[in-house]
Swiss-Prot record:
GO molecular function: hydrolase activity
Database matches in Pfam families: Metallophos (PF00149)
UniProt-listed InterPro entries: Calcineurin-like_PHP_ApaH, Metallo-depent_PP-like, Pesterase_MJ0037, Pesterase_MJ0037-like
Protein name: Uncharacterized protein MJ0037
NCBIfam families xrefs: SbcD_rel_arch (TIGR00024)
Transmembrane intervals: none
Length: 238
């Protein structure tokens, strides 16, 4: 099975990232996800930042990139937890020792500017327009129509049941003719099971059922066809 798949002139990968030239694009790192549970009183190990850094370093080495674009929801909490801000700074500053890091704003990304970082509503890269996808962006309408969109926000995933009844869950890419939605990069993010749930993003609400579902599995990338067809199959076979 494929570890990477060429779409247009970029690649999607089993590493939850899109690679274009010397750029890697990820979304939904949600730094501070573990802090949220810890502040709530749960005995939750604060290891998430280190795991996200480990996965990012793997991408840098594996795909020989010089630029990393984080497409929104870089951090998790809406409240300004000091520990989360500390983790966020450690995360960004560590990565900047190796590569150029570009930050795009998501709906969770409060307080990032006040932490001293420049953050964009969108970023143009060749024929691609990169924005988080939680809402429409203020941009020339013709430009919006002519560019292929690279989105995050949705945390797309699917749940399937195997022949012994075990439930398997896979993070996925959603590929439409006009856009691609990236899976959440944070391995702790549960994902939105789009076989059983609706898309949360208004940006893709009218078109996501026609998107191809490309799942990240232990044996590589698997294309399950359109989400609409997969839902119909699931009604009778799963």
């Amino acid at each position: 099975m494929e570890e990477r798949l060429k779409i247009k002139d970029f690649y999607i990968t089993v590493d939850r990232c899109l690679v274009y030239k010397d750029y890697a694009i990820i979304a939904d790192t949600h730094i501070g996800f573990d802090v949220f549970f810890g502040e709530g009183g749960a005995n939750f190990p604060l290891l998430q930042k280190d795991e996200v850094i480990k996965r990012t370093l793997n991408i840098i080495d594996k795909y020989k990139i010089n630029n990393l674009i984080i497409n929104g929801d870089i951090k998790h909490n809406f409240k300004p937890y000091p520990k989360e801000i500390k983790f966020l700074k450690e995360f960004i500053e560590f990565l900047r020792e190796y590569i150029n890091v570009i930050l795009i704003k998501g709906n969770h990304d409060t307080f990032i500017s006040s932490a001293g970082y420049e953050i964009f509503d969108y970023f143009e890269l060749g024929n691609y327009l990169i924005f988080h996808g939680d809402k429409e962006i203020k941009i020339d309408r013709d430009l919006l129509k002519e560019k292929f969109w690279i989105l995050g926000h949705e945390h797309p995933s699917i749940k399937l049941r195997d022949d012994v009844g075990a439930i398997l869950k896979f993070p996925t890419y959603l590929l439409n003719k006009n856009y691609i939605v990236l899976p959440a990069f944070n391995p702790l993010s549960p994902g939105n099971d789009l076989i059983n749930n609706s898309a949360s993003s208004k940006i893709i609400k009218k078109s996501y059922l026609e998107a191809e579902v490309i799942a990240i599995t232990d044996i590589g990338l698997l294309n399950f066809g359109t989400l609409r067809d997969l839902r119909e199959f699931a009604k009778t076979h799963l």
